[in-house]
């Protein structure tokens, strides 16, 4: 078989190993082969960082530059002979095709980078929307919970306020009704049992009675119904509780209606005596 009929790869291989091949051509061939051997078999499946994309672009550019340099070196070294020109004529389309493939890969890589950047922006926007919606939902949940608790408190206060009227009636009946025989005593005792159960139930719900008598008058807890002049209590002291007040969880459920001490007015005789004394002192001398 003649040398011209052998495959191009075999001719190039033999020429690369021939002692007549210039040293620079053999070095370029060796570098080109090593570069291709050192290339990864495939590009990373999913580049996740800018550094990875930059590395891929750098490798592709180096391949293209290496192929162009190899082609220029071959043209310089063996292009002066007829046989070298024939080899270059067969080799140049292959190398040009490799360069075009590299350029196509560079364009594809850039397109993927743009798509990845766009997707990252969409993901960031979606994350911001999610965070905003989550915050709005949390605020809505808290507001709804507060409104629900407030409605429950209002309903509870209204119901308990109605029950306090029943408690007042039981207390008035206990003070006014005096059983005259055993039968009436049993009936009275049964009513008081109902009263006790009602009071115990109110305590379990957080209702407690105020202790107003002897305390300083406080408009936050007391409602003054009467004022009584007296010297037995300091002015502004609650001397009698007319209607019991109640608290619900340390908040006023019903104000206590009370009688408040007022300063006692001086007697008329004392006033006249004091006036005469003042007149005697102020009478001019002649």
Curated annotation (Swiss-Prot):
Q: Which parts of the sequence are annotated with region: Disordered?
A: 1-51, 260-286
- Provide a Gene Ontology MF annotation, just one: unfolded protein binding
The family database entries (Pfam families) matched by this protein are listed as: GrpE (PF01025)
- Can you say where in the cell this protein is located? Cytoplasm
Q: Which UniProt keywords apply?
A: Chaperone, Cytoplasm, Stress response
Task: Please give the Gene3D superfamilies that the UniProt record associates with this protein.
Answer: 3.90.20.20, Head domain of nucleotide exchange factor GrpE
GO cellular component: a single term: cytoplasm
Per the record, the domain of life is Bacteria
Q: Where is the composition biased (Low complexity)?
A: 39-50, 271-286
Its GO biological process annotations read: protein folding
Quaternary state and partners of this protein? Homodimer.
Q: What does this protein do?
A: Participates actively in the response to hyperosmotic and heat shock by preventing the aggregation of stress-denatured proteins, in association with DnaK and GrpE. It is the nucleotide exchange factor for DnaK and may function as a thermosensor. Unfolded proteins bind initially to DnaJ; upon interaction with the DnaJ-bound protein, DnaK hydrolyzes its bound ATP, resulting in the formation of a stable complex. GrpE releases ADP from DnaK; ATP binding to DnaK triggers the release of the substrate protein, thus completing the reaction cycle.
- Give the protein family: Belongs to the GrpE family.
Question: What name does this protein carry?
Answer: Protein GrpE
Species in which this protein is naturally found:
Gloeothece citriformis (strain PCC 7424) (Cyanothece sp. (strain PCC 7424))
Give the gene that encodes this protein.
Answer: grpE
């Amino acid at each position: 078989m003649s040398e011209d009929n052998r495959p191009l790869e075999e001719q190039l291989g033999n020429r690369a190993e021939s002692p007549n091949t210039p040293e620079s051509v053999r070095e370029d061939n060796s570098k080109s082969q090593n570069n291709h051997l050192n290339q990864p078999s495939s590009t990373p499946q999913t580049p996740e960082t800018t550094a990875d994309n930059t590395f891929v672009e750098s490798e592709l550019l180096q391949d293209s530059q290496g192929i162009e340099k190899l082609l220029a070196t071959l043209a310089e070294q063996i292009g002066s002979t007829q046989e070298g020109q024939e080899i270059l004529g067969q080799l140049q389309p292959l190398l040009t095709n490799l360069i075009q493939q590299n350029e196509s890969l560079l364009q594809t890589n850039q397109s993927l980078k743009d798509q990845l950047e766009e997707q990252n922006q969409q993901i960031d926007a979606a994350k911001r929307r999610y965070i905003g919606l989550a915050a709005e939902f949390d605020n809505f949940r808290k507001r709804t919970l507060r409104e629900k608790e407030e409605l429950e408190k209002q309903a509870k206060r209204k119901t308990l306020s109605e029950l306090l009227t029943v408690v007042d009636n039981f207390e008035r009946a206990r003070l006014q009704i005096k059983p005259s025989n055993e039968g009436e005593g049993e009936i009275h005792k049964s009513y008081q049992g109902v009263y006790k159960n009602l009071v115990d139930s109110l305590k379990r719900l957080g209702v407690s009675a105020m202790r107003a008598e002897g305390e300083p008058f406080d408009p936050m807890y007391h409602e003054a119904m009467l004022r009584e002049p007296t010297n037995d209590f300091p002015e502004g002291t609650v001397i009698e509780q007319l209607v019991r007040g109640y608290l619900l969880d340390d908040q006023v459920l019903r104000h206590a209606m009370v009688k408040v001490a007022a300063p006692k007015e001086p007697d008329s005789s004392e006033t006249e005596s004091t006036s005469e004394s003042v007149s005697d002192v102020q009478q001019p001398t002649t």
